[in-house]
Amino acid sequence: SRVLSKYYMKNGYELKISDVIGLGQRGGGVESHFRYSTKRVLSPFIKAGDVDYLLSFEQTETLRYLHCLKDDGVVFSSTFELSTSSVNTRLEKDMPESKTELIKQSGKKTFIIDPEENKSPDFDISKMMNIVMLAIYAEFRGYPHDEMIQIVRESVPAKFVAGNLKAYEKG
């Protein structure tokens, strides 16, 4: 959300952001509500059914928040899966269905990103899925490539710039 916020601020939008971090070890999620507009934005929170775009780095999280999307909302999801703590402790069974298939069956326009597809011995893309997904989202939205590259360059610590730019190009 930090990189996107810089893009929107540079382009004259008002924005509000809220990060909600649940207790992951207890099955809680992490979510960022991000609203921008040319008009005044009063609250960062978006009610269920009003979300335009869902970007998710883990499939259970994608399924958890699918209901928040508008009918014509768009999903960007990684293929990465984590078992919940209740599955790990055998209190519950994991879903037998493919989570990717369930996401696709939602009827939403869906982009599934597989970090394994671009893995190489010298570059672990899974560590930078946020930047890969940002690049895919920015391309989908038609944001200027050069401007986004510059914002990524300005947004990450110097020692991580090269890796993040490589991840952006992979996206």
Q: Where do the PLM segments sit?
A:
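Active-site cofactor/cluster-binding pocket
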Residues: 1-170
